[in-house]
A protein has these predicted regions:
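Conserved GNAT acetyl-CoA-binding A-motif
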Residues: 94-106
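Conserved active-site alpha-helix within GNAT-family acetyltransferase domains
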Residues: 84, 108-124
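Conserved acetyl-CoA-binding loop-helix of GNAT-fold acetyltransferases
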Residues: 73, 79-92, 119
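Short strand-connecting beta-turns/loops that link adjacent beta-strands
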Residues: 38, 49-51, 61-64, 109
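Conserved beta-strand in the GNAT
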Residues: 45, 51-59, 66-72
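A short beta-loop-alpha structural element at the N-terminal edge
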Residues: 1-16
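Active-site rim helix/loop that mediates acceptor-substrate recognition in acyltransferases
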Residues: 22-48, 57
């Protein structure tokens, strides 16, 4: 039951998007591609036993700011620390790239995400 966090593709992220009911009527491969455009971006995936169970996507807003845009964890992999591992991997990559700020938005309808952000010292 080893969890592997690695750079992935939008197609891999979409495997999780389609399994998360909170994202119903949400993003498609085309909409995600358009959002990223030619911006400097990072697509992380969490892989467990060969299956993609989580993702985190972000992109550059400006030379100092990276925006953590979209992420999720498949229902069967929740409460296993997947979101925390993805967040830590993204933070490490953002720091290595020299960004000064990591910006994120969330909504009250995603209380688990709000708790994760608060636990990690984010201002919301």
């Amino acid at each position: 039951m080893t969890m592997l966090i690695r750079e992935g593709t939008l197609e891999e992220a979409l495997q999780v998007v389609t399994r998360v009911k909170e994202f119903a009527n949400g993003e498609t491969l085309d909409s995600m591609s358009q959002r990223l455009g030619d911006k400097n971006s990072l697509i992380l995936v969490a892989e467990k036993n060969g299956a993609i169970v989580g993702f985190k996507i972000g992109y550059e807003l400006d030379e100092d700011t990276f925006y953590s845009w979209f992420g999720g964890v498949a229902p069967q992999a929740r409460n296993e620390g997947v979101a925390q591992m993805l967040l830590e991997a993204q933070e490490e990559w953002v720091a290595e790239q020299g960004y000064k700020t990591l910006k994120v938005k969330s909504r009250n309808q995603f209380p688990a995400m709000l708790r994760l952000l608060l636990r990690n010292g984010y201002l919301i």
